[in-house]
């Protein structure tokens, strides 16, 4: 299967730079599957995960807080606000942040608006999904 170059960068650092067989992400209009030879595309990406299929058919997961995805003939670039490899996520920290976000929504915290609270919860759920998918992929390798 043909490959293409994928670059994933966040505001702080380069997260990924290498040849891949494909990626899956959530764009502003829905789910995207990108393989070599995909038509050029520029789209906003929603908070969630990017699932990468590497040259050796192993998979890697990266949490993205949002950003942009650009497809060119031989290169795909993801510009993310925040990007964290699934293997670098801390489950306990995510669960604690999720619990606090849920608690703030239920209690109607007066210092934040509802949309911000729901957005925070959504980001924590996406991180948890990235962590769990990475964990499953790691167990499958064993």
Curated annotation (Swiss-Prot):
Main location: membrane
GO CC list: plasma membrane; proton-transporting ATP synthase complex
Family annotation (Gene3D superfamilies): ATP synthase delta/epsilon subunit, C-terminal domain, F0F1 ATP synthase delta/epsilon subunit, N-terminal
Coiled-coil blocks: none
UniProt subcellular location: Cell inner membrane
Keyword 4Fe-4S on entry: no
Keyword Membrane: yes
Membrane topology: Peripheral membrane protein
Swiss-Prot/TrEMBL keywords: ATP synthesis, Cell inner membrane, Cell membrane, CF(1), Hydrogen ion transport, Ion transport, Membrane, Transport
MF (Gene Ontology): ATP binding; proton-transporting ATP synthase activity, rotational mechanism
Description of how the protein assembles with itself and partners: F-type ATPases have 2 components, CF(1) - the catalytic core - and CF(0) - the membrane proton channel. CF(1) has five subunits: alpha(3), beta(3), gamma(1), delta(1), epsilon(1). CF(0) has three main subunits: a, b and c.
Function, in words: Produces ATP from ADP in the presence of a proton gradient across the membrane.
Family statement drawn from the similarity comment of this UniProt entry: Belongs to the ATPase epsilon chain family.
PANTHER family linked: ATP SYNTHASE DELTA/EPSILON CHAIN, ATP SYNTHASE EPSILON CHAIN, CHLOROPLASTIC
Protein name as catalogued: ATP synthase epsilon chain
Organism: Histophilus somni (strain 129Pt) (Haemophilus somnus)
